[in-house]
């Protein structure tokens, strides 16, 4: 609603208070169908929420407090308990994970938005549009920085602010190209070349990381190579699927079979479900490394590097995402590098 303020002020100045309030009420009225539609969609994807009228408010109260047993994650090279993440968690990760060209254009868009608020040559409608985009992109982050809830798994809980960021950045680029057209037309090709290079930079990183694009860190962070020891990368353990496929292929190639009367035992350090699904019913998955045949470890801070033969190694951009070790005949007490929470 804050985004409507410039338009409301302009209406009061030109139409009078009564007409301005009437027009504002009409805007709220035409938004009601959208709220109803949103409520129905919420019911489809979250049936519990509409079983009783008070359920959404009950959920709001429940989830406003961290209800899990706290654990630690890597942030800026230090292990930090997730309820105690510093206010800088989100701005740091957004600055290090978003493409450089998006950050530059977004900064220009935010500055331009606030500068336009005091300009009389910019229409109230335009001010409202850009202020709403700016608030949609920044207000949730500011609230999180002030309230400091439990934060973990990077920026995934705040990806909803990226679309308005992208729209604001795109509008900033369009305004810049239009300004060059009217003032320095010969610079337009150079600006377009810089923009194209800015798009190709993250694209090349995504190609190198595929299918683990969600672990992307930009060149400000030094890509995933620079971020590897400072932040968590594959927190969902997606690389365990490829590691599992590699283990199966390796065993087939070696023509090895499990001991008579039992399945292969694999101790997994990381989310076990990806490995369990990928390996299938011929393998037993667990944490116990002492009785396991193989150890599958995620390339994160909480998993040990073992002194055992490496059967499979998943790497991207010289960073190890996962490994499978042959630990038959070895006494491996634990796969964890730190105590379990």
Model feature map: region roles:
Residues 3-151, 197-245, 323, 340:
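Transmembrane-lumen/periplasm boundary regions of multi-pass, lipid-linked membrane glycan transferases
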Residues 334-340:
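Short, low-complexity, Pro/Ser/Thr/Gly-rich segments in the mature regions of secreted, periplasmic
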């Amino acid at each position: 609603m804050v985004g409507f303020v410039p338009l409301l002020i302009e209406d009061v100045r030109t139409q009078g208070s009564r007409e301005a309030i009437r027009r504002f009420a009409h805007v709220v009225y035409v938004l009601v169908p959208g709220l109803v539609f949103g409520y129905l969609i919420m019911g489809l994807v979250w049936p519990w929420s509409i079983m009783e009228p008070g359920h959404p408010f009950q959920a709001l109260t429940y989830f406003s407090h961290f209800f899990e047993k706290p654990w630690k994650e890597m942030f800026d090279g230090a292990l930090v308990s997730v309820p105690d993440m510093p206010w800088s968690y989100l701005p740091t990760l957004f600055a290090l994970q978003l493409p450089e060209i998006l950050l530059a254009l977004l900064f220009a868009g935010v500055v331009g938005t606030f500068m336009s608020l005091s300009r009389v040559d910019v229409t109230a409608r335009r001010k409202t549009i850009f202020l709403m985009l700016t608030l949609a992109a920044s207000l949730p982050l500011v609230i999180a920085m002030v309230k400091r809830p439990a934060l973990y798994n990077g920026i995934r809980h705040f990806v909803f602010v990226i679309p308005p960021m992208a729209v604001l950045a795109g509008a900033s680029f369009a305004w810049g190209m239009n300004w060059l057209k009217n003032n320095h037309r010969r610079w337009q090709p150079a600006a377009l070349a810089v923009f194209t290079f800015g798009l190709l930079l993250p694209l090349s990183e995504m190609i190198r990381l595929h299918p683990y694009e969600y672990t992307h860190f930009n060149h400000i962070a030094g890509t995933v190579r620079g971020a590897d020891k400072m932040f968590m990368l594959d927190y969902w353990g997606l690389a365990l699927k490829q590691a599992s496929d590699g283990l199966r292929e390796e065993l087939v190639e070696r023509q090895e079979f499990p001991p008579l009367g039992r399945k292969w035992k694999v101790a997994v350090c990381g989310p076990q479900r990806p490995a369990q699904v990928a390996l299938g019913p011929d393998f037993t998955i667990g944490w116990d490394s002492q009785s396991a045949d193989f150890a599958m470890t995620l390339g994160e801070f909480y998993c040990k590097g073992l002194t055992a033969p490496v059967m499979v190694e998943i790497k991207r951009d010289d960073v190890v995402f996962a490994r499978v070790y042959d630990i038959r005949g070895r006494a491996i007490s634990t796969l964890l590098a730190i105590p379990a929470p």
